[in-house]
């Protein structure tokens, strides 16, 4: 087998990468055969596949690294791994990023949430910046990129955090609250983020309503959204089996 490309190499060739969110080697096989160029190992779908429960924080880092090693070893295309909040404070998260890169992750997503999360709050900005700085340092010298995901609830605060996280060393940012915006307004929100947050961006969970996509790749690619996730693999598999 030829060496798989890094995400940086894929981004140099593709303006916008549509990436299915996979959960095992079979879902990777299906995505590869469909011609996708990169993938995301979904924390939610991996939890459902391995444990049969929703994404409620029941996966631990050892289980994630075990799965990452096997799935990335099988895959012939790069995979970004959802590492939740890094499974601990800054130094722990940094060490876990290093371990995931060694296990084959082409990218690692770290969300700015605390270890104990009640009500969806995020870490204080200064603490989150410190965590991303530590994770970026841990990934230096590897081909693994750092994706900073913010779960704050307002667009203006999300933009502020994306700029700060990028300055701390994150290669890519992800604003999850785009999913909470009415579908007809999501493109304008994506544009507003891009005005201040320059660089690689991840558009979360591309969806459709009434048969029409909320946004198109052609619309968002010029604004720096070069990675777009889609959560359909597990749902498609369940539908086919039932």
Model-derived features: positions:
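Alpha/beta enzyme core
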Residues: 2-203, 212-230, 236
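Active-site beta-alpha connecting loops in nucleotide-dependent enzymes
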Residues: 209
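Structured C-terminal subdomain patch of bacterial secreted/periplasmic proteins
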Residues: 234-242
């Amino acid at each position: 087998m030829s060496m798989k490309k890094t995400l940086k190499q894929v981004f140099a060739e593709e303006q916008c990468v549509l990436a299915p969110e996979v959960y095992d080697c079979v879902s990777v096989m299906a995505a590869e055969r469909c011609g996708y160029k990169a993938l995301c190992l979904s924390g939610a779908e991996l939890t459902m596949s391995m444990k049969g429960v929703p994404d409620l924080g029941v996966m631990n880092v050892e289980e994630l690294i075990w799965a990452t090693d096997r799935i990335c070893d099988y895959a012939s295309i790069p995979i970004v791994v959802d590492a939740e909040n890094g499974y601990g404070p800054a130094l722990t998260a940094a060490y876990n990023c290093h371990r995931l890169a060694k296990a084959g992750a082409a990218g690692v997503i770290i969300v700015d949430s605390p270890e104990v999360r009640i009500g969806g709050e995020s870490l204080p900005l200064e603490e989150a910046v410190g965590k991303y700085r530590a994770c970026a340092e841990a990934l230096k010298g590897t081909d693994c990129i750092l994706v900073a995901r913010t779960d704050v609830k307002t667009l203006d605060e999300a933009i502020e955090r994306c700029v700060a996280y990028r300055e701390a060393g994150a290669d890519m940012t992800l604003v999850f609250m785009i999913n909470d915006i009415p579908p007809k307004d999501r493109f304008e929100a994506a544009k507003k983020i891009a005005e201040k947050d320059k660089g690689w961006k991840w558009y979360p969970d591309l969806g459709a309503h009434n048969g029409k996509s909320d946004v198109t790749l052609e619309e968002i690619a010029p604004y720096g959204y070069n990675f777009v996730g889609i959560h359909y693999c597990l749902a498609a598999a369940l539908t086919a089996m039932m």
